[in-house]
Amino acid sequence: MNQIDYLRISLIDRCNFRCQYCLPEDAELAYVRPQDLLTREEILTLVKNVFIPLGFRKFRLTGGEPLLHPEVVEIVRDIASLSATSDLALTTNGYLLDNLAEMLYEAGLRRINISLDSLDPDTFDKIIGNRGRSRWQKTWAGIQAAQRVGFDPLKLNVVVIPGINEAEVEDLAALTIEKRWHVRFIEFMPIGNGDLFQEKAWIANEELRGRIRAKWGLNEGQVRGNGPADVFQIPGAKGTIGFISQMSECFCDRCNRLRLSADGWLRPCLLNETGQIDLKTALRQGISPAEIRERVRELIELKAEINFKLRDSGTSSGIYTRTMSQIGG
């Protein structure tokens, strides 16, 4: 079994965007009550006393939108200050990043992923649900702030939706030519908006690779990250292009992560709901970190059987009960 050493931690299930593929505007959402979210202290306890003793060294803060969490800078500082932490990253939509980039960097964050599904303001606003006001410029300002502060690598995540932003693949890939940015194309998944998934389906990354290769050529990248992306590079480019192909290509045997939701549920597989365990309730019932650690160890041992490689969603109807923002992405 692959070494499991990477934990994705959702800080909050709320988001200031309503992206079509995640939190569509017409969806009714039951947000977690503030008192039911993991506290800063509980997150640190789990990281320090449960996950690090089990060999976890890499951590990523997600959401929802993690920058909406009032203590996000402090949580970054808490985890970054632990000597066992070898890598700490954060995924954001970038909208609030312009004002927070420097504070996050000073707190110890060095890697950041920013969602950018379009370079066209109108298309961007259509995807994120702009509610009558454009948000592209402020998001772009957040990306510029992250570069200015010194985040390296700076990664841009792109979810390609047929008929909406698929024509921009080459333009987004071109961002890597003059900048040391990493653009990652992520196949559209059936979590969050099953109706849109059924209507639009998804485009296999092999097709996108073919389009980029036809325009510039494409070399296999020399550097791999912590995740499942297959990395390539346009000849002579400063940055790289990654493809996360969770729908068309099975990468379960490379999976090295668990996911902790904002309300404390530990999930072994993004696309399979089997085997989740409630760590928050265990903590609040006074169960010791040592006993919780054993429960997590048992889940890790089962992870290879739970992974999505058999295309089992772990649901009775095939419909996921939690959205991407609730899971933590």
UniProtKB/Swiss-Prot annotation:
Chain segments annotated as coiled-coil in the UniProt record: none
Pathway the protein acts in: Cofactor biosynthesis; molybdopterin biosynthesis
Enzyme kind, highest EC tier: lyase
Binding site for GTP: 8, 60, 91, 155, 257-259
Pfam family membership, one: Radical_SAM
A GO BP entry: Mo-molybdopterin cofactor biosynthetic process
PROSITE patterns, sorted: MOAA_NIFB_PQQE (PS01305), RADICAL_SAM (PS51918)
GO MF annotation: an example: metal ion binding
Annotated binding of [4Fe-4S] cluster 2, by residue: 252, 255, 269
Disulfide feature: none
Binding site for S-adenosyl-L-methionine: 21, 64, 115, 189
Cofactor binding note of this UniProt entry: Binds 2 [4Fe-4S] clusters. Binds 1 [4Fe-4S] cluster coordinated with 3 cysteines and an exchangeable S-adenosyl-L-methionine and 1 [4Fe-4S] cluster coordinated with 3 cysteines and the GTP-derived substrate.
Positions annotated to bind [4Fe-4S] cluster 1: 15, 19, 22
Keywords assigned by UniProt, alphabetized: 4Fe-4S, GTP-binding, Iron, Iron-sulfur, Lyase, Metal-binding, Molybdenum cofactor biosynthesis, Nucleotide-binding, S-adenosyl-L-methionine
Cofactor(s) of this protein: [4Fe-4S] cluster
Role description: Catalyzes the cyclization of GTP to (8S)-3',8-cyclo-7,8-dihydroguanosine 5'-triphosphate.
Assembly and interaction partners: Monomer and homodimer.
Protein name: GTP 3',8-cyclase
Gene: moaA
